[in-house]
Design a protein with these regions (language model features):
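His/Asp/Glu-enriched, well-ordered alpha-helical/loop segment
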Residues: 51-79, 126, 145-148, 152-154, ...
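C-terminal cap of metal-dependent C-N hydrolases
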Residues: 169-172, 224-276
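Glycine/Thr-rich phosphate-binding loops of Rossmann-like dinucleotide-binding domains
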Residues: 38, 91, 114, 162-164, ...
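Short, acidic/turn-prone active-site loops that include or flank metal/cofactor-
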Residues: 6, 109-111, 177
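Short, glycine/acidic-enriched loop or turn micro-motifs at the edges of active sites
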Residues: 34, 87, 110, 160, ...
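Short, small-residue-biased leader/transition segments that mark boundaries at the very start
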Residues: 2-9
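Short acidic-hydrophobic sequence patches enriched in Asp/Glu that either
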Residues: 13, 179-183, 247
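Histidine/acidic residue-rich metal-binding segments in metalloenzymes
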Residues: 10-154
């Protein structure tokens, strides 16, 4: 009973925070997960979880919070950004919110628009992430949402962990996946080469749109007066992702051994080269 009252209080506090954010001109970024429904789940609730003997996380864990937050955004008028969406229903709710003219934006990560729970062949902690990998219909909806403009941003949800934290069963491993060093190549390979997005749309969703949503007027585009935070991307090389070559100390990726095309050759921060391939 006390937990239930606490949840009500939190919802009231969240609504109040949204109203204040609206007054202050601040956007709300939401990780959509009803933690009261997770119940120890570690992967998508489907036949794969049953096969591996693991507790599942249903799509509704995400969907009910997406619905709640969109309704509160409608009530308060606050700008709402929904982070790392993973379900078909989340995409549809964002689409309907936009059709209604609500200030709602959404993002997708490469692991969610590429992999499904069917790719988890064994109990491997590198496939444990939050939200979890979903089903094929969810992947199709996420890709369609990116193609038709419903989903505004491609992000990484970059969450590095040590090998000790990830090289264990999914029930014991930490949630999270690294993405900074693979996102560009994965997006180019899976979305641009397949004709789902153009190169310019890829740049918009990975750079321009995020800057606009964050209110960073001096970033996100190549133009006079903008900060020279840039990457130079070579679309030609084809290679196999090798986690052992990552600059990051975090090697936790399910994409190790996957063949991709395209790589970041240079990274510039404020006009200075900070990375060179």
């Amino acid at each position: 009973r006390s937990r239930g009252l606490g949840d009500v209080y939190k919802r009231q506090l969240y609504c109040k925070a949204m109203k204040i954010a609206k007054e202050k001109g601040i956007s709300v970024f939401a990780h959509c997960e009803d933690i009261t429904m997770v119940e120890g789940g570690v992967m998508n609730a489907d036949e794969n979880a049953v096969r591996l003997g693991l507790k599942g996380i249903t799509n509704s864990v995400e969907d009910v919070i997406v619905a709640r937050d969109i309704l509160l955004a409608k009530e308060t008028g606050v700008r709402l950004h929904l982070c790392h969406c993973s379900t078909a229903d989340s995409v549809e709710m964002i689409r309907l919110a936009k059709e209604e003219g609500l200030p709602v934006t959404g993002e997708v990560c490469p692991h969610h628009f590429i992999l499904t729970a069917d790719d988890i062949l064994e109990d491997d902690g590198n496939y444990k992430m939050n939200p979890p990998l979903r089903g094929k219909k969810d992947v199709e909806a996420l890709r369609q949402g990116l193609a038709d403009g419903t989903m505004d941003v491609i992000s990484t949800d970059h969450a590095p962990h040590s090998e000790e934290e990830k090289n264990r069963s999914m029930a014991k491993a930490a949630f999270g996946i690294v993405g900074l060093e693979t996102s560009a190549a994965l997006t180019y390979t899976e979305l641009v080469k397949t004709g789902i997005l153009s190169v310019m749309q890829m740049a918009e969703k990975m750079s321009y749109n995020p800057a606009q949503i964050l209110g960073l007027s001096d970033k996100g585009a190549v133009a006079e007066g903008k900060t020279a935070d840039l990457v130079i991307f070579d679309p030609n090389p084809t290679y196999t992702i090798d986690k052992n070559t990552f600059v990051s100390k975090g090697k936790n990726t399910p994409f190790h051994g996957r063949t991709v095309t395209g790589e970041v050759r240079f990274t510039l921060v404020d006009g200075k080269v900070v990375y060179e391939k």
